[in-house]
């Protein structure tokens, strides 16, 4: 007999991907832990100053005779949208997936001078 037959099941909508963001004068670094997400399911797109990250976490195969008694992990599609500042080099953004399955997105900042003198022509 099943011991935990009356535990409530957990349901969720498509969750956001948690991330950390760091900044220096030269760049912005975004770090996302993506355990269980395969590289071929990841997509990064930029549109209207927004970085959109999507992926999918696939449930490992479980023997047919096993019945779920607790479900805390989310399996399925993931999505996150991050607003980007306009003062960056959009064409130089790059990313890498580490062996620990952490996505790192490096966003170089454009140099914006504090003060510009504009000559007046005659």
Language model features: what each stretch is:
Residues 1-122:
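Alpha-crystallin/small heat shock protein
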């Amino acid at each position: 007999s099943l011991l935990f037959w009356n535990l409530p099941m957990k349901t969720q909508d498509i969750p956001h991907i948690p991330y950390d963001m760091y900044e220096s004068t030269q760049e912005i670094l975004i770090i996302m832990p993506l355990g269980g997400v395969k590289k071929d399911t990841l997509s990064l797109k930029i549109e209207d100053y927004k970085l959109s990250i999507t992926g999918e976490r696939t449930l490992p195969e479980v023997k047919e005779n096993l019945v779920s008694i607790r479900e805390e992990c989310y399996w399925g599609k993931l999505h996150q949208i991050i607003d980007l500042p306009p003062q960056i080099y959009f064409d130089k953004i790059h990313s890498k997936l580490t062996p620990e399955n952490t996505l790192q997105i490096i966003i170089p900042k454009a140099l914006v001078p504090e003060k510009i003198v504009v000559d007046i022509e005659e």
